[in-house]
Each structure stands twice: as structure tokens, then as C-alpha cells.
């Protein structure tokens, strides 16, 4: 959810750093 990962899993629209 920190936006560090463009394919994040917590909040896709926000980038989400957690998968």
C-alpha cells in the first residue's frame, strides 16, 4: 500500500507494496 510495487496486491490502484 506504499506504492513501491506497481503490481502490488493490497491496493492495485495505489501501487501497493504488499503482494
From Swiss-Prot:
Superkingdom of origin organism: Eukaryota
Cellular localization per UniProt: Secreted
Maturation and modification: Conversion of fibrinogen to fibrin is triggered by thrombin, which cleaves fibrinopeptides A and B from alpha and beta chains, and thus exposes the N-terminal polymerization sites responsible for the formation of the soft clot. The soft clot is converted into the hard clot by factor XIIIA which catalyzes the epsilon-(gamma-glutamyl)lysine cross-linking between gamma chains (stronger) and between alpha chains (weaker) of different monomers.
Keyword Disulfide bond: yes
Cellular component terms (Gene Ontology): extracellular region
Location (main, coarse): secreted
Keyword entries, A-Z: Adaptive immunity, Blood coagulation, Coiled coil, Disulfide bond, Hemostasis, Immunity, Innate immunity, Secreted
GO biological process: adaptive immune response; blood coagulation; innate immune response
Function: Cleaved by the protease thrombin to yield monomers which, together with fibrinogen beta (FGB) and fibrinogen gamma (FGG), polymerize to form an insoluble fibrin matrix. Fibrin has a major function in hemostasis as one of the primary components of blood clots. In addition, functions during the early stages of wound repair to stabilize the lesion and guide cell migration during re-epithelialization. Was originally thought to be essential for platelet aggregation, based on in vitro studies using anticoagulated blood.
Assembly mode: Heterohexamer; disulfide linked. Contains 2 sets of 3 non-identical chains (alpha, beta and gamma). The 2 heterotrimers are in head to head conformation with the N-termini in a small central domain.
Domain notes for this protein: A long coiled coil structure formed by 3 polypeptide chains connects the central nodule to the C-terminal domains (distal nodules). The long C-terminal ends of the alpha chains fold back, contributing a fourth strand to the coiled coil structure.
Protein name per the record: Fibrinogen alpha chain
Organism: Rangifer tarandus (Reindeer)
Gene this protein is translated from: FGA
